[in-house]
């Protein structure tokens, strides 16, 4: 059984989660500390001697409350922030030794605000440009394929900044895939969307699994986490306090209650009926409790 882990606030720094063994390591945090001074001059620590590995093929969700370190971790990986101490490796090479061009070929980030991904005056131009700067072969053909896959073909000549929320989000994801990185980071991909658009983007993210290698998502959307993630990393007070599957995370009440995770409503409803139930979707809920409720058709 994969080891579960919960760390109280005072846990010694050398004790850390032991994630399940996976494929080759493509990114590693080695004793990484990040700290800064507030506007009042007070010291603030985000991470203290953080150790963590991301493996090839991982589909990871980073979860935790605001200020837990999710965005900081992503910014460290793409070189937007530098650690106060420790090192970050990509494919066994320190990012300190990588030129920006070499770093961007290995890892790319799709920002929470999709508009930040648009440079050209058309979606087709943005996708093509992303591949041109990465020197991806057959970029014209690949652009058409991505426009088709992300249901953007009819919007090819539209300015991304003028699209609807869902269209804009799909376009930003297509650009992220076009960058062809070994590791793709997605910051809050379902934030600020209505219910229908959110479901559409969740389907898009699921489809992307077939054409992306390693993906890390930072999110507060627990339904997305439960339906999409194959590995969940829980951040709390600047520490990785849990690392495992959805059953290991949401089925561990210590983690859920002490870290303040809010499971999907359908999961909570299932637990209220049966504490051993682990239902993450409506279909799973109905299947789990089929026949346990009276038929009220004649009542």
Across the structure, where does each feature detected by a protein language model lie?
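ABC ATPase nucleotide-binding domains
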Residues: 1-28, 256-299
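Helix-to-loop junction immediately C-terminal to a conserved catalytic motif
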Residues: 78
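Conserved ABC transporter NBD signature motif
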Residues: 86-94, 103
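Conserved ABC ATPase "signature" region
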Residues: 137-155
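Conserved ABC ATPase signature
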Residues: 159-163
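Catalytic Walker B motif of ABC-type/P-loop ATPase nucleotide-binding domains
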Residues: 184-187
């Amino acid at each position: 059984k994969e080891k579960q882990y919960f760390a109280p606030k005072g846990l010694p720094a050398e004790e850390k989660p032991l994630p399940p063994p996976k494929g080759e390591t493509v990114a590693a945090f080695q004793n990484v500390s990040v700290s800064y001074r507030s506007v009042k001059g007070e010291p603030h620590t985000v991470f203290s001697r953080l150790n963590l590995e991301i493996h090839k093929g991982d589909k990871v969700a980073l979860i935790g409350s605001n200020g837990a370190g999710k965005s900081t971790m992503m910014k460290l990986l793409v070189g937007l922030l530098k650690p106060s101490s420790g090192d970050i490796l990509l494919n066994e090479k320190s990012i300190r030794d990588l030129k920006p061009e070499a770093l961007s070929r290995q890892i790319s980030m799709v920002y929470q605000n999709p508009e930040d991904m648009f440079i050209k005056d058309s979606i087709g131009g943005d996708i093509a440009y992303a591949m041109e700067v990465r020197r991806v072969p057959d970029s014209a053909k690949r652009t058409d394929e991505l426009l088709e896959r992300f249901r953007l073909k009819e919007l090819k000549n539209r300015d991304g900044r003028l699209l609807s929320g869902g269209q804009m989000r799909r376009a930003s994801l297509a650009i992220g895939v076009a960058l062809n990185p070994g590791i793709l980071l997605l910051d809050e991909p379902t934030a600020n969307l209505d219910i229908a658009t959110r479901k559409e983007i969740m389907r898009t993210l699921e489809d992307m699994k077939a054409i992306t290698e390693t993906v890390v998502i930072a999110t507060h959307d627990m339904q997305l986490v439960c339906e999409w993630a194959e590995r969940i990393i829980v951040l709390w007070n600047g520490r990785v306090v849990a690392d495992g599957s959805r059953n290991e995370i949401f089925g561990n009440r210590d983690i859920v209650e002490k870290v303040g995770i809010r499971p999907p409503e359908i999961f909570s409803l299932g637990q209220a009926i049966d504490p051993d139930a682990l239902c993450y979707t409506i279909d799973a809920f109905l299947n789990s409790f089929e026949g346990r409720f009276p038929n009220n058709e004649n009542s």
